[in-house]
Amino acid sequence: MNAPIKPRIDFAQPLKEEQAAAMRPPQAFVDRQDRFIAADPELEAAPEGAGEQAVEAALRPKRSPWRKMVTAGLGLFAVSVIAQGVQGVYHAWLAQDWIALGGGAAGVLIVAAGAGSLISEWRRLYRLRARAEERDVARELLASHSIGKGRAFCEKLAQQAELEAGHPALQRWKASLHETHNDREVVALYAQLVQPALDAQARREISRYAAESTLMIAVSPLALVDMAFIAWRNLRLVNRIAALYGIELGYFSRIRLFRMVLLNMAFAGASELVSEVGMDWMSQDIAARLSTRAAQGIGAGLLTARLGIKAMELCRPLPWLEGDKPRLGDFRRELMAQLKESLQRNDKKAQ
């Protein structure tokens, strides 16, 4: 059936016309800095801990006017000594004083050797400072989406680490690269494929030195010998880790690196130790199951391992990615297993 037709509706007033939307007046933007505030990405980044900021500030070379004045004074003194020596050699040559000439020649050789040593030490110190700058560059590249800088940077790191062109890890990294990869992806691939090869060597060195410290303290009855042994082995460990990452240490650079490691350990101290080891130690009740000397050996081994981890952090050219940083608890479990095996062997020999 068809629906009935609706009746017609008559409107008493005419329909109102739709009003057009009012257009806003145009607004011209002028180049005025007082209306806009530029965003600073460094300020918007997540703030680091106070300890990390203090460590970074301590590791940066400080420029002081007093230092410049002392350097200028030493330079003038060196120039005066050299000029006086040249004048003395000249007068000795005119007077044919061969003894004075021989002394002058010996002095020239000594000065040349000292200057060469100072230049070598300065070069090594500069290389150690440049490693911190390389980590800053790596952080920038890991946050960058540009193309063209990442590969050259990573190839320079491989050259510094003395990796051969045919190294398997380096070959895998080069085979994984594509022309569409940006700098962030290139550096991330290097950190995942090449850097772990060096980190694995450093971890093995840390495990070996920590185990030696643990066993030495556990079996040695002389505290003074223990302290000397631990100090010597820790210095050797820092030197070994620096060499693995392509850093050649001299006298002053070795002192500076060891100072940086101790500063880093001091600022990172209690919170990191509690978060990684504290609860695990309490749960296992080590003091109830080990002798006093064995517990002291575990503590010395953990100190060596922690120093090695901090040395790795300061010598690596790349910052730690998520999950890459060694944990102190991993070394603790290795030390416990090795110490347990050593004690069991000693018990069997005693029986």
From Swiss-Prot:
GO CC field: plasma membrane
Keywords attached to this entry: Cell inner membrane, Cell membrane, Membrane, Transmembrane, Transmembrane helix
InterPro entries noted in UniProt: DUF697, UPF0283
Superkingdom, taxonomy of origin: Bacteria
Keyword Cell membrane attributed: yes
Cellular compartment(s): Cell inner membrane
Transmembrane segments: 69-89, 99-119, 212-232, 241-258
Pfam family, one: DUF697
UniProt membrane topology term: Multi-pass membrane protein
Family named by the database record: Belongs to the UPF0283 family.
Name recorded for this polypeptide: UPF0283 membrane protein ETA_16440
Organism: Erwinia tasmaniensis (strain DSM 17950 / CFBP 7177 / CIP 109463 / NCPPB 4357 / Et1/99)
Lineage of producing organism: Bacteria, Pseudomonadati, Pseudomonadota, Gammaproteobacteria, Enterobacterales
